[in-house]
Every structure is written in structure tokens, then in C-alpha cells.
Amino acid sequence: MIINKVAQNVETIIAVDTAKNSFQMLVVNQKTGKKKNVKVQRSKFVDHILKQGPCLIFMESCSASQYWARLFESHGFTVKLIAAQHVKAFLRNKRVKNDERDAEAIYTCGIQPDTKFVRIKTEEEQTVALLHTLRKAAVSERVEISNRIRGILAEFGIITAKGKGNFNNDIQELFEQSEQIHNVNLKNSITRLFEDYHRMEEREK
């Protein structure tokens, strides 16, 4: 079997299928060909890995994988993260979720000669990326809120031109015009939407 340079001359490889509360591990001895499936609870996961001694770990790239990769690399392990779409190609049964098969697919994908791994970010790099993601989410939420306000006010004949600039320029006037709405509950709801809009603007800064 042809394997990539990362997996060559490595005696032990651990493929880990992560979940919220438990971890499925496939421990493979490359010299003997022996494979062992182990499932451990989250609280015992780190200790179980450390007991194996420094080796090669394959993990599917997910929300927590960057953290695990940095942690185990700090203990002398080599960690390689694999994009989920690449692993999926090696699943024997894609319709039925099975942790052991998932771990097997991670291992099989990890040793392929053409597998491209996901770069492990430093904590600082990950923080910057997350802040960027949060800012994008705030922009999306702000646009959604402004469209909602526009839609509600249009029901009462209050119209503003499209675009953030136009909305921001007219926002005070729009708010004052919304005061013309007689229903107190609806008026309060619109007021809260304006407040939410301003909060989203602050989050974008």
C-alpha cells in the first residue's frame, strides 16, 4: 500500500473521530498491521492519548480540532488535520453514522499520498479569524435588521432608499416617523429593532 511521506516510517497512528461527549479512536500499529478501536469519554480523552506516547494523530478538521492539535503538538505528537469533504470520500456507508467507520475513514484518508492537510493555526491566528467571522456575522445581522425595519415601515407608507448610507442618514427621521404608529406593542418592537441595529453597528467596529 502506497502511503504519504507523513505516515511513512511511523509506527503508531491514531485516527480520532471527535464528538461532543466522546471520542472514537482507531489505533493502528503500522509495523504489525494491528488495529484497535477505542471509545473514551471527553474527560479521559487527553490522558488516553498521552499514554500512547508521541505518535502521529489524524483528526477531521472541525470547530475544536485546532485546539486539540495545538495541545497534542505541545506534548510532542505530530497532528494532521483533514478537511471533512476529503474524509467523506472514504466512508464505506455515508447514510448511517458509525463512529468506528468514521475513524477508519479518517485513517484511510490520512495515509493517502495525495491528501492535503489543513494548516494548524496559532492561538493568535485563530483569534483573528474568529473576530473576523464575528464581524461578518454582525454585518449580516445588521443588514437583516435594517431590511426588517424597512419592511415593517413600508406597511405604513414610510419608505427609505436602499443602502446602508441612506438608511443611516434617514434613521433618525425614520424612527420619528415610526412614532406615528398607534399600536404600542408594535411601536415598542420597532424601537427594539432600531436598538438592535445600533448594537450591530458597534460590533462591526
Walk through the language-model features, giving the residues of each:
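Gly/Thr-rich phosphate-binding beta-strand-loop-beta motif of the actin/hexokinase/Hsp70
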Residues: 7-28, 106
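Short alpha-helix plus adjacent loop in nuclease-associated cores
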Residues: 80-119, 171-176
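Extended, highly charged alpha-helical segments
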Residues: 105-149
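Nucleic-acid-processing active sites and adjacent nucleic-acid-binding tracks
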Residues: 31-56
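Intrinsically disordered, low-complexity and often Lys/Arg-enriched segments
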Residues: 1-11, 43, 53, 78
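Glycine-rich, often acidic, oxyanion-interacting loops/wings at catalytic, nucleic-acid
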Residues: 136-205
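A short alpha->loop->secondary-structure connector
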Residues: 73-79, 96-100, 155-162
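Conserved DEDDh/DEDDy metal-dependent 3′-5′ exonuclease domain
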Residues: 49-90
